[in-house]
Amino acid sequence: MRAVPPALLAILLLVGCRAPDARERVDLLIRGGTVVTMDSARRVLEDGAVAVRGTRIVAVGPSTELDARYVADETIDAARQIVMPGLIDGHGHAGHGLVKSLGMDTDAFYPATEAIYARGSTVDFWRAEAFLTGAERVRFGVTTSLSFLGGGDMVMRTDDAKYGDAYLQAMEQVGLRFILAVGPRRPPFPQRYVEWVGDSARPVDVSFDQQLAVAEELIRTWHKRDDGRLQLAMAFPTHHPEQTPLRGAALDSLVAQARATRALSKTHGLLFTQDGHSKYSVKFADEVFDILGPDVLLSHATGMTDEEIAIVARTGTKVVHNPSANAAMRERFRLVELLDAGVTVMLGSDGVAPDRSYDMFRHVFQAMRYHRAAWQDTKVLPAGKALEMVTVDAARALGMADEIGSLEAGKRADIILVDAARPHMMPAQMPLYRLAYFANGNDVTTTIVHGRLLMRDRVLQTVDERRVVDDAQREADLAIRRTGLDSLLQTPDGFWGRSRLP
């Protein structure tokens, strides 16, 4: 046998004796970025890193420190990027993605949504809308959202579970952390819905009991699916006693329905939410419906009285503020007073119709401008508080403070990367101000939910984007055709050359 040369033998012995890598193995290491943790100390780490194993964060710290502790199956170079918790949207509407701008400069928006959601939509409509708005959220770094299964004046598509099933199946594939709010629509009952089979329409009269039963079916099928990533919430229409006074049997019936819906939320341990609160409706919800509490989220809640702010604070009820919504223009949202009373307030988009977006950076900026203008004071709503309202405060409002909202060991790996080297984001110092004042959703490069990459380097990973937009266009066209709303696609009189619409 041929002898091994001494030099080669020495190399082989050296390699063979090398100590094994003692570093812990993780699935993903994001390193080299500016890490905005939103933890209790609100740490910002220059050249920071986040280590992920499975669905959870295992460590956050300086890149050099985590490099020494962990070896990763996959590493993301976050140089010249901001690494932060995924954004959270507390109020939206399923369906709105396919009715954008429809009737917005007239009084036709609510009737149009009622017609389409109740009588012009199909399973394919709801599925296509979920894929479309799911893709939009992923692109904008919105990792957690709550949406009602319908909209307008509480037109809920809960006449049959198949619509909610289709919606949640799509969201399951997209990969978002998602809460679907279901429940009855506004009375009286029965309400007329239409089921479409091909080109054939079948009218269906739907009762309150039927809608509540469909809601419970969806809860049993979907709540806490995929390791808790998909959840259900219960919703009930907000009653405005000043606008629609009720007495006698009509009031008794409404109260019974509200309490039955609230009881279902408690039975299943669900968040309970209401849309469209304004002056006096919060007091009614507390004193007549008796439905408020720490697991309740009230949306809009504009024009609240001092007494109502005290009620919300006393009951521990949470509030979602939609600064870009039309409702916020009709009455002031009393954010400063609510925060000073100790109420948890988060931000919401109010969906994307008729004139909005799921870009939560846009709503952060809008919230600051809205309240500073209202108070004529540029010190109102500091940028840091606005960022908290789409991260840590938002997580608390949804009852998820132990799971999401900040980058900390043990929390779910809901993480986004924001390009900090684009012209409008430069110079790169003061990253917190860049996020609050200059960033927009299109600056997000990478979105991670539950430890899974949903978008990397601006490329969606879980859906075919071209197919998503093509399906959305087709279903929007079909819904408008079924309901005969083609005229609403035209530019209205008064669009050009006037100081206000007629």
Residue ranges and their predicted role:
Residues 266-268, 290-296, 311-320, 340-345:
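Glycine-enriched alpha-helix->loop->beta-strand junction motifs that scaffold or abut catalytic
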Residues 12-48, 52-63, 391-502:
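Active-site microenvironment of metallo-dependent hydrolases
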Residues 291, 336-425, 438-440:
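His/Asp/Glu-enriched, well-ordered alpha-helical/loop segment
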Residues 88-90, 145-147, 178-182, 230-236, ...:
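Hydrophobic faces of well-ordered beta-strands that scaffold small-molecule active sites
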Residues 101-177, 213-227, 473:
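Alpha-helical scaffold segments that flank or form the walls of functional sites
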Residues 21, 159-296, 307:
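Metal-coordinating catalytic core of metallo-dependent amide/deamination hydrolases
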Residues 98-128, 155, 159, 187-204, ...:
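Active-site gating loops and adjacent loop-to-helix segments of metal-dependent hydrolytic enzymes
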